[in-house]
Curated annotation (Swiss-Prot):
Keywords: Chloroplast, Membrane, Photosynthesis, Photosystem I, Plastid, Thylakoid, Transmembrane, Transmembrane helix
GO cellular component: chloroplast thylakoid membrane; photosystem I
The name this protein goes by in its record: Photosystem I reaction center subunit IX
Protein location: Plastid, Chloroplast thylakoid membrane
Keyword Transmembrane among UniProt keywords: yes
Origin: domain of life: Eukaryota
Membrane-topology descriptor: Single-pass membrane protein
GO BP, one annotated term: photosynthesis
Similarity remark: Belongs to the PsaJ family.
InterPro entries given in the database record: PSI_PsaJ, PSI_PsaJ_sf
Keyword Transmembrane helix: yes
HAMAP family: PSI_PsaJ
Organism: Gossypium barbadense
Transmembrane segments: 7-27
Length: 55
């Protein structure tokens, strides 16, 4: 029973920290790239990879 009490007290704290940090990360990404459907750093990799430069 003590293990169940420990689990029930730790899981909400960990999930709150996890979702809080995830929300903060998404807020910061949205601050630097507002209203972005695609993010430029992914697009740059696709453009560079699609050039087909050969040695």
């Amino acid at each position: 029973m003590r293990d169940l009490k420990t689990y029930l007290s730790v899981a909400p704290v960990l999930s709150t920290l996890w979702f809080g940090s995830l929300a903060g990360l998404l807020i910061e990404i949205n601050r630097f790239f507002p209203d972005a459907l695609t993010f430029p750093f992914f697009l740059i990799r696709v453009i560079v990879a699609g050039r087909g430069e050969k040695d």
